[in-house]
C-alpha cells in the first residue's frame, strides 16, 4: 500500500528535525531530472518567474535567489548542512495534519516507506529525501526539452517510481493499492493506465449550514491526518483506513464506492 500527497508552497526552513533518522536520509530518486529543470529555472530573471508563476515581486525575488543557490552533484550531494528532509521542509495545511515533527522514529520510518510526495521539481519524493528549497508547481507551463509543461517533462518517470515502491510494499504482503491524497493538479502527473495498482481516492466533506461539501482548508489537513493515522497504526490493508476517525471524521459507506471513499465531519466536530 502506498500514499501520495501534494507538496506545499510554504516551507519550514527553521525548525530542526525532531528525531534521529539521519541514517535513513537519501537523495531524491529523480535528482538528475530535477537538475535539468533547475538549469532552466536558473536562466529566469525574477520578472520571468513572476509572469510564469503568477507570484508577487517579493516571491519572485526570493525564488530567483533560491534557484541560484540550488546546487547538487554526485560529488556534492544534499546533506544536513545544505538541505532538509522533504517531509519536514514542506509546510501548510496538509503538513499540519501530517505533523512529522511530532512523530516517533517508527512512525517516520513507516512514512518513508509508504508515502510519496509529488513535486514539480523533484518528481516524487520520500519524506526523508534531502531537498533544497524551491517553488515549481506541477501545473506550471515551463517549456523544456520534452514539451511545453511539466506533465510532458515527467512522462512516465513518476509512475515508474511509484510502481517500484508499491512492488516493494506488496512483496511484504501489503495491499497493492494506491491511496490518492494528492490534488488533481499533482495526481495528473501519475499515468493511471501505467499504474500497476488499484487507486482509492478519499474525499473529505464538512458540514456547513446543514449541507456537506469539500472545504479546501479542512480537506487538505484531513489528507495529512489520514496519512499520519496510517503511520501511527502501521496500516497495511486499505480496508483498515475506513476506521479513520481523527478530528471527528467518519467513513460513509452508502456514499462510497470502490474508487472513492467518502468521509464526513459534522459541524459540531469542526
Swiss-Prot record:
| Any one of the GO BP annotations | response to hydroperoxide
Q: Which InterPro entries match?
A: YaaA
Please provide, in alphabetical order, the Gene Ontology terms of the cellular component aspect for this entry.
cytosol
Report which superkingdom the organism of origin falls in. Answer: Bacteria
- Name the protein family: Belongs to the UPF0246 family.
PANTHER family to which the protein is assigned, alphabetical: PEROXIDE STRESS RESISTANCE PROTEIN YAAA, PEROXIDE STRESS RESPONSE PROTEIN YAAA
Name of the protein: UPF0246 protein PsycPRwf_0637
- Organism equals Psychrobacter sp. (strain PRwf-1)
Please spell out the taxonomic lineage of the organism that makes this protein.
Answer: Bacteria, Pseudomonadati, Pseudomonadota, Gammaproteobacteria, Moraxellales
Amino acid at each position: 500500500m502506498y500514499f501520495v500527497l501534494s507538496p506545499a508552497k510554504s516551507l519550514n526552513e527553521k525548525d530542526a528535525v525532531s528525531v534521529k533518522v539521519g541514517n535513513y536520509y537519501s537523495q531524491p530518486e529523480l535528482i538528475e531530472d530535477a537538475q535539468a529543470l533547475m538549469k532552466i529555472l536558473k536562466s529566469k530573471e525574477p520578472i520571468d518567474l513572476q509572469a510564469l508563476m503568477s507570484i508577487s515581486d517579493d516571491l519572485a525575488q526570493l525564488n530567483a535567489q533560491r534557484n541560484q543557490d540550488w546546487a547538487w552533484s554526485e560529488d556534492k550531494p544534499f546533506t544536513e548542512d545544505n538541505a532538509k528532509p522533504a517531509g519536514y521542509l514542506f509546510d501548510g495545511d496538509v503538513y499540519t495534519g501530517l505533523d512529522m515533527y511530532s512523530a516517533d522514529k517508527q512512525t517516520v520510518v513507516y512514512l518513508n516507506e509508504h508515502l510519496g510526495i509529488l513535486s514539480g521539481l523533484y518528481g516524487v519524493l520520500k519524506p526523508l529525501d534531502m531537498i533544497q528549497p524551491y517553488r515549481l508547481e506541477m501545473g506550471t507551463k515551463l517549456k523544456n526539452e520534452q514539451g511545453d509543461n511539466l506533465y510532458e517533462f515527467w512522462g512516465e518517470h513518476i509512475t515508474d517510481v511509484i510502481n517500484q515502491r508499491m512492488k516493494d510494499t506488496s512483496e511484504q504482503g501489503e495491499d497493492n493499492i494506491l491511496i490518492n491524497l494528492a490534488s488533481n493538479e499533482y495526481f495528473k502527473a501519475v499515468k493511471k493506465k501505467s499504474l500497476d495498482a488499484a487507486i482509492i481516492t478519499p474525499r473529505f466533506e464538512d458540514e456547513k449550514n446543514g449541507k456537506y461539501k469539500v472545504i479546501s482548508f479542512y480537506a487538505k489537513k484531513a489528507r495529512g491526518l489520514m496519512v499520519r493515522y496510517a503511520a501511527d497504526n502501521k496500516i497495511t490493508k486499505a480496508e483498515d483506513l475506513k476506521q479513520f476517525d481523527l478530528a471527528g471524521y467518519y467513513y460513509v459507506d452508502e456514499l462510497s464506492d470502490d474508487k472513492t471513499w467518502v468521509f464526513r465531519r459534522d459541524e459540531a466536530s469542526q
